[in-house]
């Protein structure tokens, strides 16, 4: 009898998620100290940030109703899609003449933000095409592109300019095979929030280059105001332009339910220049047949009836932790943080010359975990060698302990 030939597909072999691989497979530290995870952007740790009671109540009612146990349309239920359109229109589109462009029929639900990224990229890009991708950037863009044979032109976001995108570099990188421009605002991993002018400059550049725009706005509204009381989030939906735009949003971050796996893609194209983009979203969504139905049933309550004070409190807690970390991590030898302005992350430069036996950001990550049981992420994962990323969602007391451990670690490895 011949042996079985059961081998992994070439496609599966191309799939690699660096954040999950590093965080899920890190070797246990021999340190007796309890682990401090500052690696994965999960806002539910410690129950420091809580889902609203009304949201939980609505989910329970949906389960008990026996009305949500069957199939919904693959694009999502009409009620959930209407809730997304209404919330986005009322929250992030300030020009009255543009509000009519945000409609239910242009919303496609997805099973979380990562699924939305896959849908948006593969809806318009074939193998051999290219996407313009930010660096530092969320690694899942690269995960999807590599899995589907899509090339990437990486453009820089500059730390010296509050992590703004290098627009001249985007212009130079664009070629005949480029099909899509990807932007992230507020940014994972940078913790940045673009000014309205910079968002408009990106939109105008996409217009000039005739490139559809995929805007990852999963952290919409999560902006810090302590240093700038006038700081605000600007969506690419809030501009009159001929650019077809697909905007990613979801419940994972500001509504504190990443495990519910519910996001959305909002197509904005009042001039009708990219209708096949929307059709592509609908088709690739059929591969999963839509997100969880009971969660869809709770979406309207979550978006439209969660008290603004609850959402503001979530952002305020994240900002408090972010600013504590920013104000104290620089006390550690070799670390120079950049100012966090939104999302739930802080990036710090690592001056490797300050250490006698740490040569890369990956070594910094590995040794810090081994010796102090503090888990951060190396900047290399985000195409930012020489940096480290720390999450900012945990209580301040956690960061007090983390800073003390990191400080001791850096002192121990400091060059003489």
Curated annotation (Swiss-Prot):
Enzyme superclass (EC): transferase
InterPro entries linked: Aminotransferase_I/II_large (IPR004839), NHTrfase_class1_PyrdxlP-BS (IPR004838), PyrdxlP-dep_Trfase (IPR015424), PyrdxlP-dep_Trfase_major (IPR015421), PyrdxlP-dep_Trfase_small (IPR015422), TyrNic_aminoTrfase (IPR005958), Tyrosine_aminoTrfase (IPR005957)
Pathway: Amino-acid degradation; L-phenylalanine degradation; acetoacetate and fumarate from L-phenylalanine: step 2/6
Keywords: Aminotransferase, Cytoplasm, Mitochondrion, Phenylalanine catabolism, Pyridoxal phosphate, Transferase, Tyrosine catabolism
GO molecular function: L-tyrosine-2-oxoglutarate transaminase activity; pyridoxal phosphate binding
GO biological process: biosynthetic process; L-phenylalanine catabolic process; tyrosine catabolic process
Cofactor: pyridoxal 5'-phosphate
Domain of life of the native organism: Eukaryota
Catalytic activity: L-tyrosine + 2-oxoglutarate = 3-(4-hydroxyphenyl)pyruvate + L-glutamate
Localization annotation: Cytoplasm; Mitochondrion
One of the record's GO cellular component terms: mitochondrion
EC number(s) stated in the UniProt entry for this protein: 2.6.1.5
Residues the record lists as N6-(pyridoxal phosphate)lysine modifications: 253
Entry comment on modification after translation: The N-terminus is blocked.
A Pfam family matched in the record: Aminotran_1_2
Free-text function comment from the UniProt entry: Transaminase involved in tyrosine breakdown. Converts tyrosine to p-hydroxyphenylpyruvate.
Assembly notes: Homodimer.
Sequence similarity: Belongs to the class-I pyridoxal-phosphate-dependent aminotransferase family.
UniProt xrefs under NCBIfam families: tyr_amTase_E, tyr_nico_aTase
Name of this protein: Tyrosine aminotransferase
Organism: Trypanosoma cruzi
